[in-house]
Design a protein with these regions (language model features):
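Juxtamembrane inter-helical linkers in multi-pass membrane proteins
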Residues: 37-56, 92-104, 192-214, 374-386
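Single conserved hydrophobic/aromatic residue that forms the stacking wall/gate
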Residues: 1-12
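Membrane-embedded translocation segments of transport machinery
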Residues: 233-328, 334-335, 364, 376-379, ...
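Structural signature of hydrophobic alpha-helical transmembrane segments
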Residues: 14-17, 102-110, 246-260, 306-319, ...
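Membrane-interface alpha-helices at helix entry/exit sites of multi-pass transporters
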Residues: 52, 56-69, 208-214, 337-349
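Hydrophobic core segments of alpha-helical transmembrane domains in multi-pass membrane transport
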Residues: 16-28, 69-85, 117-123, 136-146, ...
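Membrane-interface capping segments at transmembrane-helix boundaries
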Residues: 187-192, 450-454, 518-528
């Protein structure tokens, strides 16, 4: 077991390091487009929240106090839920007999996460994008799931949640993939511009670097290309001598990693810019599907094929995760006036440190909770990936029709001007995580439209953004504290109470109180 853990740890480290490096260098050429040229057009909810924390800390006074109070409220609220189970983390229409009957008989159920952090995220995203995202959830949960539940055999034994995983989520995957391809086509000019700059610098021609203002100065394209080539060379060695052992299959695997990571980097950045959520699991699932099909076509299947596909998917997944997170860092830097080149350089060190530690974390989680068996970590995305790979590698059914439906829907949405990526994210992410975004968006709309004085409305909206940022920061911080306590063996969770109807009703009441607190506190704002 120890040798196996060490072997897996080495694989995790290399996947994380190579994927992280690719994510950084493939995003840098697109920094200016997402951060500068699209300034004011994307909400960047996570970047906004973090920037509010930094700015309020710099200003001090009332803003810092307000942020600290909001962080304490949001953090304490989420902490007592995750650590003690004081009330349920989410409520659903099953809370009453009629709702339970609708869920069991008609497969219609509505869920709502009651967390403070998600409420704050919805406030920052705003009503427009929150509504589009939740519309995708409504289509799946209120049309697709009940419709499928009415025609499948033995429907009584299948829950709406299972129908969502089996039918709704694949439609979302198809939509995300097509929305990503549409985004790639639309951003072809940006891609060509980045490639043109690379060719120009590689040829030794002078660029306008000397006249570029400090806050727009990136690492040189020559250095970026050097890192790309070095990373691909290291991946070549890793695939050949650590995974595949066949040069033809190794070259194919390397091509898959580079092409998909390069193309979907812009999709990951776009998703983070809009909703603050990276659809990396959906894009990784598409990577696994494509890589599995290609690997099977060149004679690699079975367990060795699944292992190869997972390694390829792991590298791409890490690259897209890094790209999505890094665009947030760069946007924050743009707002506070940092030098992008310095951020980019230090990110390489951060990637190396993360790669060295993530393997240990994975091994500890496996030894503490396990990934299979009773009481194991749920790992829903990992289970979905396994379900995708197995039929492709070992023979079975793949939901191509559902992928196709999602892709066609994304094209239709694009043609009528609806952001297909946001809508598809709604189909992929569970309803209970999307519905609170609308609640937060409604709070933002309400507080910013009550006065006839535009200055008052702006002051209220800004104050609410600070409170929402506090909710997000406090919830995230206390979530880490709660996880550390659980890992240390502290078992303070009242499971029997947390699963009761009383806890669910209390959760609904506490959520309403949190919304009321946020709206009341925000409405107190006055223009400076």
């Amino acid at each position: 077991d120890l040798r196996m853990s060490r072997g897996l740890g080495d694989v995790y480290k290399r996947q994380s390091l190579f994927g992280g490096l690719l994510g950084i260098v493939l995003l840098i050429p697109f920094r200016s487009y997402f951060v500068k040229e699209m300034h004011g057009k994307y909400p960047f909810p996570e970047a906004t929240a973090t920037t509010e924390v930094l700015v309020s800390g710099e200003k001090g006074g009332a803003q810092a106090k307000l942020l600290a109070v909001a962080g304490a409220v949001g953090g304490l609220y989420d902490f007592v839920v995750s650590t003690f189970g004081a009330w349920t983390e989410s409520v659903s229409t099953r809370i009453c007999d009629f709702g339970a009957m609708c869920a069991d008989k008609f497969k219609v159920v509505f869920g709502l996460n009651t967390g403070a952090a998600v409420l704050g995220l919805g406030y920052i995203i705003g009503l427009k994008y929150a509504t589009i995202i939740t519309a995708g959830s409504c289509l799946v949960w209120f049309l697709v799931v009940p419709l499928v539940g009415s025609v499948i055999p033995d429907a009584a034994s299948v829950s709406p949640e299972q129908l969502f995983k089996d039918f709704g989520r694949p439609i979302g995957i198809g939509g995300i993939a097509m929305a990503g391809l549409v985004g790639i086509v639309r951003q072809a000019g940006i891609i060509r511009q980045a490639l043109g700059l690379a060719v120009k610098e590689l040829g030794g021609k002078k660029t306008a670097e000397q006249t570029t203002v400090r806050t727009q100065r990136d690492l040189t394209m020559r250095l970026i290309l050097t890192v790309v080539i070095a990373t691909l060379a290291a991946l070549l060695v890793f695939f050949q001598f650590g995974v595949l052992g066949n040069w033809a299959q190794t070259l194919v695997a390397l091509a898959i990693v580079f092409v998909i990571a390069f193309l979907f980097t812009t999709v990951a950045a776009n998703a983070i810019a809009i909703v603050g959520t990276n659809p990396v699991s959906g894009m990784t699932l598409m990577t696994l599907i494509l890589s599995s099909l290609v690997l099977v076509s060149i004679g690699l299947s079975g367990k060795s094929g699944m292992t190869a596909a997972l390694v390829i998917g792991g590298v791409v997944c890490t690259a897209l995760s890094m790209a999505g997170g890094f665009i947030t860092d760069l946007k924050i830097g743009y707002w506070i006036g940092t030098t992008p080149a310095k951020q980019e350089a230090w990110k390489f060190l951060g990637t190396a440190v993360s790669a060295a530690t993530v393997a240990g974390v994975m091994i500890v989680l496996n030894r503490t909770y396990g990934f299979v068996g009773e009481g194991a970590l749920v790992a829903p995305q990992a289970n979905a990936m396994a379900a995708v790979i197995q039929p492709l590698m070992e023979g079975g059914t793949t939901p191509w029709v559902l992928y196709f439906i999602g892709a066609v829907l994304a094209l239709v949405l694009t043609s009528i001007g609806v952001p297909a990526l946001a809508f598809s994210l709604g189909m992929f992410i569970p309803m209970e995580l999307n519905a609170p975004l609308v609640v937060g968006g409604l709070v933002a709309w309400y507080v910013s439209t009550r006065s006839k004085d535009a200055a008052v409305n702006k002051a209220r909206l800004d104050r609410g953004t600070l409170i929402a940022s506090g909710f997000i920061a406090g919830g995230a911080l206390m979530g880490v504290v709660s996880a550390v306590l659980k890992f240390a063996g502290a078992d303070w969770y009242f499971g029997q109470w947390a699963s009761s109807n009383g806890a669910e009703w209390l959760g609904f009441a506490m959520y309403a109180a949190l919304i009321g607190y946020m709206a009341w506190h925000t409405m107190r704002a006055k223009p400076e």
